[in-house]
Regions:
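Short alpha-helical DNA-recognition segment
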Residues: 17-36
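Short, basic-rich loop-to-helix N-cap that marks the start of a DNA-contacting helix
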Residues: 41-51
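Alpha-helical residues within the helix-turn-helix
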Residues: 14, 25, 54
Length: 70
């Protein structure tokens, strides 16, 4: 069974009324990185995950979750 990280970044960002650019600027990455992250094509570093969770004022484990797939 393969493990992978799922995230709630897009859902939380939309709920917060923030654009991809807003989030990217706040966590010091490109908008393209946020796009890739939201589409599940990019797994963030621990530092970036902490910054993103901080942006939403949530624990990292509420934003990023380990899933088990086939």
């Amino acid at each position: 069974m393969q493990e992978y990280i799922k995230n709630e970044v897009e859902t939380l960002r939309l709920r917060a009324g923030a654009t991809q650019e807003d989030l990217a600027l706040r966590v010091n990455v490109s908008r393209q990185t946020i796009i890739a992250l939201e589409k599940g094509r990019y797994t963030p570093s621990v530092l970036l995950a902490i910054k993103i969770a901080g942006f939403f004022k949530m624990p990292v484990e509420k934003v990023f979750k380990i899933h088990h797939g086939k």
